[in-house]
């Protein structure tokens, strides 16, 4: 049985004010998450917090009762917020407090977790540091890239990481080495409550002409094969071993498949798009339908790459496809 929690941000804010009155960041009750995610759909965040800086975030976490659930979101490019909203506190780092790109060595940067990937690529271009061009084609922020080991054009975030800096749910600081991140394909194995705040990244010497050419190639490829002007969350599913997700989706007849306002893109069928008025229910139901059809056709069990968070709207629950249960 699924329990549904009433979203009442005003009441939660009033409850927390006595202990959190000293924060400098912004607290917004009942935040419409449609304004945050690239799908432009989904429910409310009960209390939405944007910390002013790392000190502010640590103070907030240290004084937030442990009974209050915390959800971390980034730029929202690969995020689906369910229609029933997100109980508790949603934390999103702002570019103002966590968007620095500081060159700290001839080929190294200290980068805030709220930095847009494309801005990191641009900074590396100006500094003539190679190895960051692939970020020009990733529509997200560094925090999400660190979490998911984001990559493109054969390069992954793990190839650039030296150290990652994080706060845990209690507001304690942690420094993680590359080995501590335990990276694998689109995954890192660190505690779920860690909030990445920054990372030390290392590239290699380069020249502006070659770097710009590599970035242009990334942009041209992305424009030619991905529905970049649609309301989408990027790649819907991780690639199975030894084959592309789009190929098994296409072979199963799911290119263009539609449920409500949600559709698997005709241009790139591993991209799910909101054609106009899709609900989160439509999008998740479409994804699970694709998973079932692909498994029935080819026995490939697709795993979601898009992050799905929050609670379902009462009476509109999407069951996760499980062929073994």
From Swiss-Prot:
Q: Which Pfam families match?
A: FAD_binding_4 (PF01565), MurB_C (PF02873)
Q: Which family does it belong to?
A: Belongs to the MurB family.
GO annotation, biological process: cell division; cell wall organization; peptidoglycan biosynthetic process; regulation of cell shape
Species, as recorded: Bartonella henselae (strain ATCC 49882 / DSM 28221 / CCUG 30454 / Houston 1) (Rochalimaea henselae)
Kindly state which keywords UniProt assigns to this record, in alphabetical order: Cell cycle, Cell division, Cell shape, Cell wall biogenesis/degradation, Cytoplasm, FAD, Flavoprotein, NADP, Oxidoreductase, Peptidoglycan synthesis
Subcellular localization: Cytoplasm
Q: InterPro entries, from UniProt? A: FAD-bd_PCMH, FAD-bd_PCMH-like_sf, FAD-bd_PCMH_sub1, FAD-bd_PCMH_sub2, MurB, MurB_C, MurB_C_sf, Oxid_FAD_bind_N
Requisite cofactors? FAD
Instruction: State if Oxidoreductase is listed as a keyword.
Output: yes
Query: Which GO molecular function annotations are given, in alphabetical order?
Result: FAD binding; UDP-N-acetylmuramate dehydrogenase activity
Look up the record and name the pathway of this protein: Cell wall biogenesis; peptidoglycan biosynthesis
Reaction catalysis annotation: UDP-N-acetyl-alpha-D-muramate + NADP(+) = UDP-N-acetyl-3-O-(1-carboxyvinyl)-alpha-D-glucosamine + NADPH + H(+)
Q: Which HAMAP family match?
A: MurB
Superkingdom, according to UniProt? Bacteria
> What does this gene product do?
Cell wall formation.
Keyword Cell division on this protein? yes
Enzyme active site? 186, 235, 305
Q: What EC number(s) would the UniProt record show? A: 1.3.1.98
What protein name is recorded for this chain? UDP-N-acetylenolpyruvoylglucosamine reductase
Report domain FAD-binding PCMH-type positions.
40-221
Please give the start and end residues of each transmembrane region. Answer: none
Q: Where is it found, in Gene Ontology cellular component terms?
A: cytosol
